[in-house]
């Protein structure tokens, strides 16, 4: 499998990690769209949100959200932040390994674009 994020998990590609545990890694986005912009990804390869299993991945999905919230607060986003997940081409997904973008420390607008 030639998955960019799996290669980051394996340590084959460097990333500026801000957090890691046995289930997830969080690292700064290479093209930040806000003063704070990091990704939270599972170590387990799951290509899209359609591939999540309620039976097997419910705890992992919850852990990703809690990790995003905790790290956003640690990075000074107490006034608010945005969490974005894209799914498939029409949803804007470009890396087929689920991931959350967490953006903060600036005013967010709607619609996003």
Describe the role of every protein-language-model region.
Residues 1-113:
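HIT superfamily nucleotide-processing domains
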């Amino acid at each position: 499998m030639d998955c960019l994020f799996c290669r980051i998990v394996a340590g084959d590609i460097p990333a500026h990690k801000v957090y890691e545990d046995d289930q997830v890694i969080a690292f700064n986005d290479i093209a930040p769209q806000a003063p704070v912009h990091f990704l939270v990804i599972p170590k387990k390869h799951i290509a899209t949100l359609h591939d999540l299993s309620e039976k097997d991945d419910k705890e992992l999905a919850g852990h990703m959200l809690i990790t995003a919230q905790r790290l956003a607060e640690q990075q000074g986003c107490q006034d608010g932040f945005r969490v974005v997940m894209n799914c498939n081409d029409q949803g804007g997904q470009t890396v087929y390994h689920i991931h959350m973008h967490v953006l903060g420390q600036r005013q967010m607008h709607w619609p996003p674009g």
